[in-house]
């Protein structure tokens, strides 16, 4: 599947300092090395939100690029599930991913869009209210939440989520100086809050040779073990994108 919208690959972030759309090059320079810092993201979304009319900011690509992957997965999950599926868009920023799932999923969903930046959360709340975003299924719900995803188990109950989506959050953390530990914490906590039938999908431009080794290492010794897989999403402008699927697997009884 060819990606039909390309916006910002993290590995090319430094090139943005030359782009006409950015006037404060210091913002991008700081972002490159401080992607794990809340204050950095508050500044990022404040400066982007002050540029006039609101526009969703997407890392990698927008919802159309993964629509044919996400919606069938939700439909399959709903066949053996009573009530709305609980979906977490982790590190949502001002992406339209969560709202698009809410407005296009035929099966009932409860979409929680969570971000560490209250600035991003407020921008998204205001935008969806002003555009009167409506659900595809009348039983669906959309909520925005300020949340540090390293504290996920303090907010969500064990085995309460059906699907966790990560479009750029882990990539941002592992590329920052002090973020790899946080990325590992998020992965292990995700496994704790996912239902046994659930999945954690990471969308990334990192090559499987590197990401799979990291994922398999991080899930070892976790309270909930996991199966790890990957499929290629597509390629555009020389950048390949992948979907890494991490699924909880109960430990065998001794």
Swiss-Prot record:
One of its GO terms (molecular function) is protein-lysine N-methyltransferase activity. Keywords: Methyltransferase, Mitochondrion, S-adenosyl-L-methionine, Transferase, Transit peptide. Citrate synthase-lysine methyltransferase activity is inhibited by S-adenosylhomocysteine (AdoHcy) and oxaloacetate (OAA). This is Citrate synthase-lysine N-methyltransferase CSKMT, mitochondrial. Belongs to the methyltransferase superfamily. One of its GO terms (cellular component) is mitochondrion. Residues 1-45 form a transit peptide. GO terms for biological process: peptidyl-lysine dimethylation; peptidyl-lysine monomethylation; peptidyl-lysine trimethylation; protein methylation. Its main location: mitochondrion. Its EC number is 2.1.1.-. Protein-lysine methyltransferase that selectively trimethylates citrate synthase (CS) in mitochondria. Seems to conduct trimethylation in a highly distributive manner rather than in a processive manner, and thus introduces a single methyl group per binding event. It catalyses: L-lysyl-[citrate synthase] + S-adenosyl-L-methionine = N(6)-methyl-L-lysyl-[citrate synthase] + S-adenosyl-L-homocysteine + H(+); N(6)-methyl-L-lysyl-[citrate synthase] + S-adenosyl-L-methionine = N(6),N(6)-dimethyl-L-lysyl-[citrate synthase] + S-adenosyl-L-homocysteine + H(+); N(6),N(6)-dimethyl-L-lysyl-[citrate synthase] + S-adenosyl-L-methionine = N(6),N(6),N(6)-trimethyl-L-lysyl-[citrate synthase] + S-adenosyl-L-homocysteine + H(+). Gene3D superfamilies: Vaccinia Virus protein VP39 (3.40.50.150). It is found in: Mitochondrion. CDD domains: AdoMet_MTases.
